[in-house]
Amino acid sequence: MDIKELTEAMHNFVHSKGWYEPDSKRPQTPRNLAISLSLEANEALEHFQWQGELKDKDELASELADVTLYLLQLASVSGIDLEQAILKKLETNASREWNTESDDSSRRVSGKG
């Protein structure tokens, strides 16, 4: 499946639960989806808290799937073509200078985003 097919499958699931209905107890707003995305990402972090190695790969896979589903939904309801955004970001990152002198080599020398 590609990103568009995964997004469609996610929307079908959400529709089947009635979560897009105006009276839903789980309003699927960009704000709520961003919060849920962050919470699920934090659940993925729990798999590494106080331990050096991953103990349950299947559980982590499940959390990563949750993160991905919320990401797909947030992008979609916000009108963002995630595939194009990813390609653009990869292009931006390829032309960026990265700080390799410090302990934090993930830091950029310049540029935003």
Question: Model-found features: residue ranges?
Answer:
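Flexible "arm" and connector segments at domain edges
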Residues: M1-L64, T68-G113
